Structures are given as structure tokens and as C-alpha cells.
A protein has these predicted regions:
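Aliphatic-rich helical/repeat scaffold segments used for oligomerization and domain docking
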Residues: 1-272
């Protein structure tokens, strides 16, 4: 569908959002623009970028976007290009500004998680008891990055069995650390999400992590945050928007119930 190529950029570098000007400079160079022909002003860069894309069929992937303001100037003027934007929150303005299809990615199923583990370990887990792999996947909360980390741990410690890693992950105080190795670790990803929260929402994230159970209702949330139900719901919904909490139903009085993924709850407790 896109014979003229692809452009890809991770919009966060070393935990910080890239400025649109820097992204435009990189894209213009990728499109063959000599460095001395790239304008200084960001609006001029955007105009040149759109003229370069005019009439072309290019797939543009903008990964880890933090806001509509960050991606606005990166959208092509031509209807022949495709744009894939990924992000956790802050992109509602994008939905309102263009012909956009929103796809929310849910959690992997147990079978999908096991399949991912087998793929990462190059099928070295073929002889492993399927129930052990399902337990390992559950301890990773079926989060792809956590599953990848677990698979890499098993690959780098080939004398370990899946049971060995399961035993290490059963300790809730060590689970996040066990799955956080390297520059692009699970903890660093969670840290970036936390840093992108407003001060009030970040404080709520930390305090809600102190709740003893993964699942809680609005009344418990309000009590934990020492605020009204309306204020608590607003703060909690911000965390839902950021995919840090999930809605799992309603209580007997019609209020929402929320659930942490355990790894995020451990991170929230230590954040702040």
C-alpha cells in the first residue's frame, strides 16, 4: 500500500519528548533534503516536509507520542500517506482534528502470552509444562514488554528453567526488578509514563498504589486519596486514560470498579 517507503520515529528519547523541529529535520533528511536546505523555523520545516510528501504514498509511524501538539506538524497534507500514531494518553485532539480511527489495544490472552514467550525464546520452552508458562505469563501481567523481558532473561540464563524464573517472580518485592534490565527496561517505561502525568495525577497514582488489593471501588479510592468521590473519580479516570488503571465493571451501587496490573501497582508504591 505504501510503495514510496516508510518513516519511523520514537517520539521519546532518553525519557524526554522530542521537539517537532528535531523530528522534522530527521524526516527531511530521510526524504533526501540536504542539510543546508532545511529551514530553521519549525513552520517552514513543516511546509517543506508536506511538499516533499505531496503525491507520495508513505507510511509514517509516530511512536510514543505524548500530545497532539507534538504530532500536529508531523501529519502530511496529502491524503495518500498513512499515519500510525501510538501513545498512552493526550491524543484526544488528534481524533477531533482529522479522519482518525482509534484502536485501543487490550491485554494479551493467556494463550497469546505463552505464544509470545515461545517466540522470544525461539521455541526453547517447547518441553516446558504449559501450566508453568501460563503462570509465568500471569506474573508478567500479560504485558508484552514484561513478557519480552522474561523471555530475554531465560535466553541469557540458559541454565535457568521457566520454573526458576517463576520462583523468582513470585516475590512481589522483586518482580519489577527481575523484569527491568537494560536501557529500555520495564521500570524505565513505567517511569516515563509517571513523568508525563500532572502533579495531581502523579500523586494520586502513588497513593492509590498503597491499596492492599489490585481491585478497588470508587469509595475506597476516594478514602485513599482523602477527597470527594467526584474529585477521586476525575483523578482515577485520568489514570485510566493513561492506561495505568483499567475499569473492570461496576459495584452493587452502580459505581465503577478499577483494577491495577500488579507490576504497575508495585511501581506506583515506589513512585513519587
Amino acid at each position: 500500500h505504501f510503495p514510496d517507503g516508510q518513516l519511523f520515529i520514537d517520539l521519546q528519547e532518553n525519557g524526554l519528548p522530542l521537539h517537532p523541529r528535531e523530528v522534522l529535520h530527521r524526516f527531511l533528511r530521510a526524504l533526501g533534503t540536504p542539510a543546508d536546505r532545511i529551514p530553521v523555523g519549525v513552520e517552514e520545516c513543516a511546509a517543506l516536509y508536506r511538499s516533499k510528501l505531496d503525491g507520495r504514498r508513505v507510511l509514517i509511524t509516530l511512536d510514543n507520542a505524548v500530545s497532539f501538539a507534538q504530532v500536529r506538524l508531523l501529519l502530511p497534507g496529502s491524503g495518500k500517506c498513512g499515519v500510525l500514531v501510538t501513545g498512552r494518553d493526550g491524543l484526544n485532539d488528534l481524533l477531533e482534528s482529522s479522519d482518525t480511527l482509534r484502536v485501543r489495544l487490550g491485554a494479551l490472552s493467556s494463550d497469546e502470552s505463552v505464544s509470545m514467550l515461545r517466540s522470544i525464546t525461539r521455541d526453547s520452552l517447547t518441553a516446558t509444562d504449559p501450566e508453568t508458562l501460563r503462570t509465568l505469563a500471569a506474573l508478567c501481567d500479560h504485558i508484552p514488554l514484561a513478557l519480552r523481558a522474561a523471555g530475554i532473561r531465560l535466553q541469557s540464563r540458559q541454565h535457568w528453567s521457566a520454573d526458576d524464573l517463576v520462583a523468582r517472580l513470585r516475590d512481589p518485592e522483586q518482580r519489577l526488578a527481575e523484569l527491568s534490565h537494560g536501557e529500555n527496561s520495564l521500570r524505565s517505561r513505567f517511569d516515563r509514563c509517571f513523568q508525563n502525568l500532572s502533579t495531581r495525577v502523579a500523586a494520586a497514582y502513588h497513593r492509590l498504589g498503597s491499596i492492599d488489593t489490585p481491585e478497588f471501588d470508587l469509595t475506597t479510592g476516594a478514602k485513599t486519596l482523602s477527597t470527594t468521590s467526584a474529585e477521586a473519580e476525575d483523578l482515577i479516570e485520568r489514570l485510566v486514560d493513561a492506561h495505568l488503571l483499567e475499569v473492570v465493571g461496576r459495584d452493587a451501587w452502580g459505581g465503577f470498579r478499577y483494577r491495577w496490573k500488579e507490576l504497575l501497582r508495585f511501581h506506583a508504591r515506589a513512585a513519587g
